[in-house]
Amino acid sequence: MAKKSKVARNEQRKQIVARYAARRAELKELIRKPSTPEADRAAAQAALQRLPRDASPVRLRNRDAADGRPRGHLRKFGLSRVRVREMAHRGELPGVHKSSW
């Protein structure tokens, strides 16, 4: 079980990333385009740096939806490997069964 503060901080970051996503994409496109004048490119880079640090999607962490475990996250389920195993054994994940060969 992850600390509640870590889970809450990650949720806050998700909201900040969503809020600034369009502006970041716009600025990054300006910086990336070769036809952008050098002065505009420098202004766009400065504006991008002025955005909050948590607006970058790289700072998000994939966490288990049930208990917030940060490692062993399986995207398909949104759960950690430990939680997937437990739920699969109990039959709570439709279409998932223990393989044997």
Swiss-Prot record:
Q: Which keywords accompany this UniProt record?
A: Ribonucleoprotein, Ribosomal protein, RNA-binding, rRNA-binding
One Pfam family linked to the record? Ribosomal_S14
Q: Which InterPro entries match?
A: Ribosomal_uS14, Ribosomal_uS14_bac/plastid
Q: Which superkingdom? A: Bacteria
Locations of Basic and acidic residues compositional bias? 61-70
Please give the GO cellular component terms listed in this UniProt entry: small ribosomal subunit
Q: Cross-referenced Gene3D superfamilies, in alphabetical order?
A: 1.10.287.1480
Name the segments for region: Disordered: 31-74
Q: Name one GO biological process term.
A: translation
Q: Does the keyword Protease apply?
A: no
Q: Name one GO molecular function term.
A: rRNA binding
Q: What does this protein do?
A: Binds 16S rRNA, required for the assembly of 30S particles and may also be responsible for determining the conformation of the 16S rRNA at the A site.
Subunit details: Part of the 30S ribosomal subunit. Contacts proteins S3 and S10.
In terms of PANTHER family, this protein maps to: 30S RIBOSOMAL PROTEIN S14 (PTHR19836), SMALL RIBOSOMAL SUBUNIT PROTEIN US14A (PTHR19836:SF23)
Name the family the entry cites: Belongs to the universal ribosomal protein uS14 family.
Record-given protein name: Small ribosomal subunit protein uS14A
Q: Which organism is it from?
A: Nocardia farcinica (strain IFM 10152)
